[in-house]
Curated annotation (Swiss-Prot):
Keyword rRNA processing applies: no
SMART domains in alphabetical order: DISIN
Record text on subunit structure and interactions: Monomer.
Region of interest (Disordered), residue spans: 51-72
SUPFAM superfamilies found in the cross-reference section: Blood coagulation inhibitor (disintegrin) (SSF57552)
Record-given protein name: Disintegrin cotiarin
Disulfide bonds: 6-21, 8-16, 15-38, 29-35, 34-59, 47-66
Source organism per UniProt: Bothrops cotiara (Cotiara)
Length: 72
């Protein structure tokens, strides 16, 4: 939704303020394959294992999303 930084559906989420749908102070992310304990995983961390001839997908260190490698 517009203006939301995170999914405010779960009040127990330690990264997201359920009342405002904003990240809590100090949090970089609230969910995603490249989010761990409210912080972006480091660049190069595997977020999706290789399948077939495609290599592993790896976090960028700048986002909670797991980017698809260029071979997909």
């Amino acid at each position: 939704e517009a203006g939301e930084e995170c999914d405010c559906g779960a009040p127990e989420n330690p990264c997201c303020d359920a009342a405002t749908c904003k990240l809590r102070p100090g949090a970089q992310c609230a969910e995603g394959l490249c989010c761990d304990q409210c912080r972006f995983k480091g660049a190069g961390k595997i977020c999706r294992r290789a399948r077939g001839d495609n290599p592993d997908d790896r976090c960028t260190g700048q986002s909670a999303d797991c980017p698809r490698n260029r071979f997909h």
